A protein has these predicted regions:
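Class I SAM-dependent methyltransferase Rossmann-like catalytic core
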Residues: 2-40
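S-adenosylmethionine/decaboxylated-SAM
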Residues: 19, 31-179
Length: 179
């Protein structure tokens, strides 16, 4: 049921002319991410790298009661469009979300949460920094682990914090659930 709900909602919610096209493979990616949230039903969540809000919408469909703190610097060429699209999605779907418009590398701490999604800076240093920002969060979902720098950051983070990562190939990008 959740998978179908996401498959129906995402294409309608997609930003027009987005360079990141919504296709069946992309939908499966968001379904896999939403399944993690559905399993834990967090009361609070942090999303580092919210861009257009596609993950946020998928998470909301999996756990509508979750309150989200989203962080994004919106520094790319399409950032203004993405930011406005994010605002529309949050309003249209009545998602409990607040956003901090800041480069996460400028942050030294974030509030406590039950779940975190790390999908911000895809460099080794950036991903490692973002993971350490949410180190006290019980469940962390790291995206883009098919990127060697991100995967190494996840592995090094787990080694230094004595946590475990379960990697999943969702057909688009590898995800890591860190517990």
């Amino acid at each position: 049921m959740l998978d179908q709900h996401i498959a129906d909602a995402l294409p309608k919610a997609w930003m027009r002319d987005d360079w990141f096209a919504c296709d069946a493979q992309v939908i499966r990616h968001y379904q896999a991410k939403a399944a993690v949230v559905a399993a834990i039903q967090p009361k609070t969540g942090i999303e580092i790298g919210t861009r257009c809000g596609y993950s946020l919408l998928s998470f909301h469909l999996a756990s509508p009661q979750t309150h989200w703190l989203c962080v994004d610097g919106w520094v790319d060429s399409d950032s203004m469009q993405c930011r406005e699209h994010w605002k529309r999605l949050v309003a249209e779907w009545t998602i409990h979300a607040h956003v901090m418009r800041i480069d996460s590398r400028k942050l030294t701490e974030l509030p406590a949460a039950d779940f975190a999604h790390v999908d911000g800076d895809h460099s080794y240093a950036g991903a490692l920094h973002d993971l350490h920002l949410v180190a006290d969060v019980p469940t962390i979902l790291a995206d883009d682990c098919d990127n060697a720098s991100v995967r190494q950051a996840v592995e090094d983070f787990c080694a230094s914090t004595k946590r475990k990562a379960a990697f999943t190939d969702d057909g688009l990008r590898q995800l890591a659930v860190i517990t």
